[in-house]
Amino acid sequence: MESHIVLIILSGLVIVSYLLDIFAKKTKIPSVLLLLFVGIGIRETLDYLSIPVFDLLKILPSLGTIGLILIVFEGALELDYKREKNKLIFSSFMAALVILLITVLAVALLIQYYTQLPFQLCLINATPFGVMSSAMAIPSVASLSSEKKEFVIYETSFSDVIGIVLFNFFMTNQVIEAQSFIDLGIETVAILIISAIFCLFLLYLIGKITYHIKFFLIIAILIMVYGVAKIFHLPSLVIILAFGLFLNNAEQIVYKPFRKYFLYPTLQEDLQLMHTFSAESSFILRTFFFVIFGFTMHIRDLMDLEMLKFGGLIMIAIYVIRFVYLKFVARIDLNPILFVTPRGLICILLYFSLPPEMRTPTVSTGLLFMIILATSFVMMYGIMKAKKEKV
């Protein structure tokens, strides 16, 4: 394919994504869901015309990881910390932790019932289905009240972090024993210390850079640190979340030496520019990731009745567990928080991180696709329902 044709296609996808984003904001249909359908439509058209296609599955993990970093960073930059929000933060953290753990356990039991495979293997395969997608949830809740929006941002970001930690924990501990939890504790303390040092270093660096190109450098450092932390199996997404929160709330710190050496006059201006940069960059990456994921899917996979039955049981588990926790434990307004539990980018990334020999027969890309579509439609229904009641 000639280079100018490729340029036309890529720029056309960005324009279409921009228009779909505007359409999504007016209709409350998740924009990423529309992008999936664009990818499916392109694939079906090419298959119909018998045009050969490229295998794009190999670039999905890298593209998705960079997109995830930017989306979590963008979401963290929107969070203003105040002491009175401690209850909200704790509530969202506990919701993310408890719901994820129980959902993973329930899905693992379903997988074991269907496959009779070892429970440890079933847990690893179940983990992707327990993790909420901040990439899909955060852009979809822009119209909610500030408290509900912040709850979703915190919960989905915590869910991403905990899900990755849990997945790595299962992958690196074939036999779970006391030492496994000690190692996890050490890793958690290590990442918190690294996050604190890293936040101070980057804020100092931003203040000292006088060259007009600085934000690409900061994002590149974020991505590099994320990658290095992943090599050592550390929950690297914590660094991204911590830096975004720290940057947006640095001016609230009253410690005089900190204000003297780290704060600078144009911090708020740089913060606004960085937020714009991360938002536009995540928009581009989200566009290509979900279009490519839709492109790699085969719509005929959804015709498998056994897969639909199994997927239906997973859906029931997801929403029953969420309802019980939010209603009787967290005791928060269910509308529309109950419905905002989409699966998406993290789910896909974790699934493709599984070595082929560790994937169970029941967990396939078709099942993944079905759960992503179904949870997206449920979220869309919940947000549209909340909008009507608000009117």
Predicted regions and their residues:
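Transmembrane helical cores of multi-pass secondary ion antiporters/exchangers
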Residues: 1-391
